[in-house]
Amino acid sequence: MDIIIEAIEQAGFSPLPSNEEDAGAFEAEGLRFGWEAKDGEAVFYTSLGVLPQHPSTELCERLLEADCLGIGTGGGHIGLYEPTRTLLYSFRTRVDGADVPRLADMLADFVGRAPAFIRETTEFSAAQSDECVMPFSGAMLWV
């Protein structure tokens, strides 16, 4: 979708080539983010890493606390993609009728929060076990 690409560029991020009109990826803050659009909405996402097989209570509490009503995530959400145990940080918004500057601001806020969540998740995971896996370098989402 053109509005999404325009917003990504206006926010100062680098869209990556895509063969799809309603899905793609971009790079920002040294991370890769993905996006998909459908029915007038878009979801933006990135990996926070892989949830350990036996996560600590502290990690679970921190993720739930951050995700509570979207307050600690700036309206984004943290969820688990179970087949790969990947923690995803995502943000969904309407794009039909949206204006590019507002969408760019929302993306900048979303992207700005991701490194802290990744760092915190990685630190909690590494402190509790040897099975800590860093975030994927590529964006992924179930389709």
Task: Enumerate the language-model features and the residues they cover.
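A short acidic-to-branched-hydrophobic micro-motif
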Residues: 35-50
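Ampiphathic alpha-helical segments that act as solvent-exposed interaction surfaces
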Residues: 62-63, 71, 93-126
